[in-house]
Amino acid sequence: MNPLEDSKANPFEIAKQAAAVIAEKTGVAQHDIALTLGSGWAKAADIIGETVATIDATEVPGFSAPAVVGHLPTIRSIKLPNGKHALVLGARTHYYEGHGVRRVVHGVRTAAATGAKIMVLTNGCGGIKETWAEGTPVL
């Protein structure tokens, strides 16, 4: 059972636990920026820097395997050219999946707990127009 399903559990404590696991598994004590890349955007992480570590999301408290096509089951730590570290969240939960808001915002809470002061969110928005494929940029 995901610990966020327990209504008595403190979601901020679970985010701190998740951040501790991420620090342990990546060897990176603090991340400076976090990115949630929408469907089709995973390759963007490959060009922003050097991957330090890739973690199976199910090994991190509060995260689970993605239920949406195009999402990755991973959390990555990337060293940027300026020496800072980016946390890339491939696994996340959408509200329409029916797990509640606590699981939806867990990635952002965890990113903040890792030290990230900047969060970049992207989405695939593939359902808006049939001619758009995964990764089509929309502003």
Predicted regions and their residues:
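Metabolite-binding pocket within alpha/beta catalytic cores that recognizes anionic/polar moieties
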Residues: 2-139
